[in-house]
Regions:
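Amphipathic, non-transmembrane alpha-helical secondary structure
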Residues: 13, 17-21, 71-75, 93, ...
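N-terminal glycine-/serine-/threonine-rich beta1-alpha1-beta2 phosphate-ribose binding loop
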Residues: 32, 36-78
Length: 315
């Protein structure tokens, strides 16, 4: 099939590679404009642009995909299908309805659940047993198009946002290729989404990672995993940010008198871990990163920093 691919971040790269490896004709790649980064403000390519350039594929970078001039330029590529994976802009009906097979989107959730941005992280934060990937035929709504194919993935006990991202990226790449095969063969019957079952997730911001120790240890442990590696869960100690990268949940700590502790209080300090009281249960902290320092296991942190029981975190 003659394909135009629209995508921007790392998550989309695997799908572009899979389309190329499957022998489809990628006529053009559409991605977000280059962004200035660092002190030098030098322009940096998106991961998808890097991949396209490596394969000698034409790259288009519209500021606004809705601009009529871009729509008309896109039309000249005569695509059979447009594949959209985390492109980063809403598409007008003039693009959605342009190709013979429409615009096919790869979404990292089991639609209609977890429509919107950041479905991967939220699946971990919410403690979902399963996540997955859905391919759908796009319409003008937010992840509301007809479902084409679905693949479920069971989350591991210590799944992080990063590990699930990698797994679903691989699943999505192969599922999209299967979807293109099915569309071409006429063996796929689109299924309308049940809007009554839909849920939407919010876009994540750095501030969301601030830990509220009044919550249960189980909730906070999932937050830590879901926001690893970005934007990360954090608290404060002596006015410095302390990121917490890995922790376990403990329901009871034998040496702690429950009625004497407050949420956010350090209640035990061992050789390799320390424990924080929460609204319900305790967090046993295994890996941290103090502001201005590298990530390290808690043992290394404790050897370089004097931490005592009774210290209140979050201040």
């Amino acid at each position: 099939m003659r394909v135009v691919f629209m995508g921007t971040p790392d998550f989309a790269v695997g799908t572009l590679k899979a389309i190329i490896e499957a022998g489809h004709d990628v006529a053009a790649v559409v991605t977000q404009p280059d962004k200035p980064r660092g002190r030098s403000k030098s322009l940096v390519f998106s991961p998808v642009k890097d991949e396209a350039v490596a394969h000698g594929i034409t790259v288009l970078q519209p500021e606004r995909a809705r601009d009529e001039a871009f729509v008309e330029e896109l039309r000249t590529y005569n695509a059979d299908v447009i594949v959209v994976v985390a492109f980063g802009q809403l598409l007008p009906a003039s693009i959605i309805n342009m190709p013979r097979y429409g615009c096919i989107n790869v979404h990292a959730s089991l639609l209609p659940k977890y429509r919107g941005a950041s479905p991967i992280q939220w699946a971990v934060i919410d403690g979902c047993e399963y996540s997955g990937v859905t391919t759908m035929k796009m319409d003008e709504g937010l992840d509301t198009g007809d479902i084409l194919m679905v693949e479920k993935v069971k989350l591991d006990a210590k799944e992080t946002g990063g590990s699930l991202f990698d797994r679903l990226s691989d699943v999505g790449a192969h599922l999209l290729v299967k979807t293109l095969e099915g569309l071409e063969a006429g063996t796929i019957t689109p299924v309308k989404q049940d809007d009554s079952e839909s849920t939407y997730v919010k876009m994540l911001h750095k501030s969301f990672g601030k830990m509220d120790f009044n919550k249960s240890a189980a909730e906070l442990e999932r937050l830590i995993r879901g926001l690893n590696p970005w934007p990360s869960a954090f608290t404060y100690i002596d006015g410095k940010m302390l990121k917490i990268w890995d922790a376990d949940v403990a329901d009871n700590i034998s040496e702690v008198q429950t009625e004497e502790v407050k949420p956010g209080q350090v209640v035990t300090v061992g050789k390799n871990t320390f424990t924080i009281a929460c609204g319900q249960g305790y967090l046993v902290v295994n890996e941290v990163q103090l502001e201005g320092k590298k990530r390290m296991d808690s043992g290394s942190f404790l050897r370089g920093n004097q931490l005592e029981t009774g210290v209140m975190l979050g201040e």
